């Protein structure tokens, strides 16, 4: 039952999918944390895998960069493959001075400069928020592991290289914790088609201070975030 962008067979995906932007990161997650792994799709090298984690079936697939790419894969996973839970896992740039590099941010809501949710909501503003059950599961997992997390709004940007850096001042004033490029679109798709979605990201750099993590620090923090998220996923 291939779609235009996924060539997996029916039933290839678990109900819960971890959803990093980078397909090679999806491969890394599958090979590092899952058992009995099978690659289930590879159209346009957007790799997807299904395996087990602590005995529960879990999938992981790349979403690509930005809301348009993420929305395509999220829509097909939900509508054509019956996926119920999509958890974006990735990195972001911090905005708030209270947020530090290596912190983990849970995107309770996603602001955006994209028009996609207005297009699907008849021109009105749509509250792009995470699913409470998914969010609570990850928060509880973080408590068990002692992982430092921040819960609040992220900003899903259409442009990586923004022509208006003064917008960062507005974001900080409004309490935005970090900037990424997918969550608002993912939340919109999930609400439209009756699925559940969440964005969990590590802070790889601080937009305001210029501080950046090293590659080793980034990998360690990412691994901790993935374990925390997988432990939450098996409770769903």
From Swiss-Prot:
Chain positions of site Important for catalytic activity: 218
Protein name, as recorded: Purine nucleoside phosphorylase DeoD-type
Gene designation per UniProt: deoD
Organism expressing this protein natively: Shewanella sp. (strain MR-4)
Description of how the protein assembles with itself and partners: Homohexamer; trimer of homodimers.
Catalytic site: 205 (proton donor)
GO molecular function, one term: purine-nucleoside phosphorylase activity
SUPFAM superfamilies the UniProt entry points to: Purine and uridine phosphorylases
Record keyword DNA-binding present: no
PROSITE patterns the record matches: PNP_UDP_1
Catalysed conversion reaction: a purine D-ribonucleoside + phosphate = a purine nucleobase + alpha-D-ribose 1-phosphate; a purine 2'-deoxy-D-ribonucleoside + phosphate = a purine nucleobase + 2-deoxy-alpha-D-ribose 1-phosphate
A single GO cellular-component term on record: cytosol
Residues annotated as binding a purine D-ribonucleoside: 5, 180-182, 204-205
